[in-house]
UniProtKB/Swiss-Prot annotation:
Keywords from the named record: Carbohydrate metabolism, Glycogen metabolism, Glycosidase, Hydrolase
HAMAP family the record matches: GlgX (MF_01248)
Species annotation: Yersinia pseudotuberculosis serotype O:1b (strain IP 31758)
Protein name: Glycogen debranching enzyme
A GO term, aspect molecular function: hydrolase activity, hydrolyzing O-glycosyl compounds
Length: 662
């Protein structure tokens, strides 16, 4: 019979010290915590945790070894009006587990009870936590440490990026191992990508609603165990764990000079609303982990049924420890925080919130690239530009302005210029650098770039919600024909705008983020909310990729890295050498000219050498170039023996870059 000694309240989680396992679990309101140990046949042994230090329950299992399966049962009041939902009939996952065995199905035994506790035992249905102790030889791995001014982010899904790549062995496609394959790394290097941002790779589950429809949470934002690598993206090769496979991939990417940023989800948990499954925090200490209303209901500021209370001291430390685990154990270079406003809620948003203070005080984490999605759906949830120094932010105002300028004719050039200059009004006056603006035309959430030019309406019927899900405010333009089938004239206009938007993104000041597949002409058939589509709709079709567009994109990124005004990460000032704003006659734009309605022609001179010519109108125009000798530069022309230009004739919806001869 296994016996627990008192052990220690630290380190947190389940820790193997070479002689046994120390177990800890936080619960401020529990009356008893029971450690449940499972053998290979699923037989359960229950042992009361023998000690409590403050709010940490702990015990030590002499002789315990890695591979031990475990979970917890936590007893206490079931009093929803006070926020307590303890139910010892429910086996619970350790919030700090670093591995899980099994899957979470749509099983009624997970129900914890709404007004009364549900007495059905859930142990047989719940995945078991695994104690792991994996040493790893990083072979001198060092972070690429790409300066923000040179950073080009590529947002991708592990499976979507690699599942159909013909040069990756079939058994590795869709896995972490595929990220390490030379064919994939060559693509990233050829493009000029410096930083790969991965959609969640933490252990996530599929919502019961999706399971009933035969769908899955493809994006992975329904995270159950944020310390654990999701085994769904592992190849399953013998002797290679999911954690090792992810480490191998990150090491290979680092060897190629590519950073890795993980998309992390700390705004809500997979337990959803009161009708959702009781799997972890709800049963451990509901009142500490979640934002609750005065009557004990979940404050659903995320739209996902619950919101994690990150201002609670222990929950703050849980997040910090999790981030440090990924940084230390997997050498990740940064994090993108989903619905990041929740990070700063106290409950109102506060730049000095406990989690922000803890991040700033942690030397290791504050040196990482930290990116926030600066909104949630709660009161005061939109916080673009308001995150503390050290964060960069997804800039949806940039996205909408550039779409509106090129596709709708709704945005004047003054607004275009302000966002082209890293949305300076949002960030400069608040002591932030241009790199704080994460510029994007598209992201995983919404239309792809090609679909933005082919669909005026979303087409999300496959999601099973009768096309109600997904945004209706897309600022798209199908140029007169809904869908991918259109005549040559329409496709000519679409392709011109496709290149114009890519050029704008990659030559704007700030940090560009390219959605994987946009450089290939990937379409999701008009689905702008493909979160549940784990199929060819979201997987990149490498066989039909637009090779010319890929070359165009790579040339743009190379061009970007040559222009000091874009790479030095300093604000442009009036009269300096970084930028001059010119009209179609090559003259400096006057204050009055900036205010002239929706004028959509201008020239932008960068670093006194590179001239960006913009015609966002629906007709051809002629521009007179500023003084000097100008010639084309790839991808807009060939510099060898090029014709020297004094004027530029631009077709509708076009952008061009010229270089000044020395």
């Amino acid at each position: 019979m296994a016996v627990l000694t008192h052990g220690s309240p630290t380190p947190s989680g389940a820790y193997f010290d070479g002689k046994g396992i120390n177990f800890t679990l936080f619960s401020a309101h529990a009356e008893q915590v029971t450690l449940c140990l499972f053998d290979e046949q699923g037989q359960e042994r229950q042992i009361a945790m023998p000690a409590r230090t403050g709010d940490i329950w702990h015990g030590y299992l002499p002789g315990g070894k890695p591979g031990q399966r475990y979970g917890y049962r936590v007893s206490g009041p079931f009093d929803p009006s006070r926020g307590h939902r303890f139910n010892p009939h429910k086996l619970l996952i350790d919030p700090r587990t670093r591995a899980l065995e099994g899957k979470v199905g749509d099983d009624p035994r997970f129900t914890g009870g709404v007004s009364q506790p549900d007495v059905r035992d859930s142990a047989a249905a719940l995945p078991k936590c695994l104690v792991i102790h994996e040493e790893y030889d990083w072979q001198g791995d060092k972070p690429p440490a790409i300066p923000w001014g040179n950073t080009v982010i590529y947002e991708a899904h592990v499976r979507g990026l690699t599942q159909l790549h013909p040069d990756i062995p079939p058994e590795l496609r869709g896995t972490y191992a595929a990220l390490a394959h030379p064919a994939l790394i060559e693509h990233l290097k050829t493009l000029g990508i410096t930083t790969l941002e991965l959609l969640p790779v933490q252990f996530h589950i599929d919502e019961p609603r999706l399971q009933k429809m035969g769908l899955s949470n493809y994006w992975g934002y329904n995270v159950l165990a944020p310390f654990a690598v999701d085994p769904d993206y592992a190849s399953g090769r013998e002797g290679i764990s999911p954690l090792r496979e992810l480490r191998d991939a990150i090491k290979a990417l680092h060897n190629a000079g590519i950073e890795v940023i993980l998309d992390v989800v700390f705004n809500h948990s997979a337990e959803l609303d009161v009708f959702g499954p009781t799997l972890c925090q709800r049963g451990i200490d509901n009142a500490s982990y979640y934002w609750l209303t005065p009557d004990g209901e979940y404050d659903n500021i995320t739209g996902c049924g619950n919101a994690l209370r990150l201002s609670h001291p222990y929950v703050t430390q849980w997040v910090i420890d999790c981030l440090n685990y990924w940084r230390d154990s997997c050498h990740v270079d940064g994090f993108r925080f989903d619905l990041g406003t929740v990070l700063g809620r106290t409950p109102a948003f506060d730049q000095h919130a406990p989690l922000f203070a803890a991040l700033a005080a942690d030397e290791r984490l504050s040196a990482c690239k930290l990116i926030a999605e600066p909104w949630d759906i709660g009161l005061g949830g939109y916080q673009l530009g308001n995150f503390p120094t050290g964060f960069s932010e997804w800039n949806d105002q940039y996205r909408d302005a550039m779409r509106g300028f090129w596709l709708r004719g709704e945005v004047p050039r003054g607004t275009f210029a302000q966002h082209f200059a890293a949305s300076s009004r949002l960030f400069e006056q608040r002591g932030r650098l241009p790199s704080a603006s994460i510029n994007q035309i598209t992201a995983h959430d919404g239309f792809t770039l090609l679909d933005l030019l082919c669909f005026n309406q979303k087409h999300n019927q496959m999601n099973g919600e009768e096309n109600r899900d997904g945004s209706d405010n897309n600022h798209s333009n199908n140029f007169g024909c809904e869908g991918l089938v259109a005549d040559a004239a329409i496709w000519q206009r679409r392709k011109a705008c496709q290149r114009a938007l890519l050029t704008t993104l990659l030559l704007s000041q700030g940090t560009p983020m390219l959605l994987a597949g946009d450089e290939q002409g990937h379409s999701q058939q008009g689905n702008n909310n493909a979160y549940c589509q784990n199929n060819i709709l979201t997987w990149l079709d490498w066989g039909s990729a637009d090779r010319a567009l890929m070359t165009f994109t790579a040339d743009l990124i190379r061009l970007r890295q040559q222009i000091p005004a874009l790479t030095q990460d300093q604000w442009w000032q009036s009269g300096d050498s970084n930028v001059q704003w010119l009209d179609s006659q090559g003259q400096a734009l006057s204050d009055a000219a900036w205010e002239q309605g929706c004028q959509q022609q201008l020239q932008i001179l960068l670093s006194q050498r590179w001239l960006v010519l913009i015609n966002a109108t629906d007709h051809e125009c002629e521009m007179h170039l500023p003084e000097g000798e100008w010639e084309g530069i790839p991808p807009f022309g060939v510099s060898d023996h090029a014709e020297r230009l004094t004027t530029w004739r631009g077709s509708a919806h076009t952008i061009c870059v010229l270089i000044k001869r020395d």
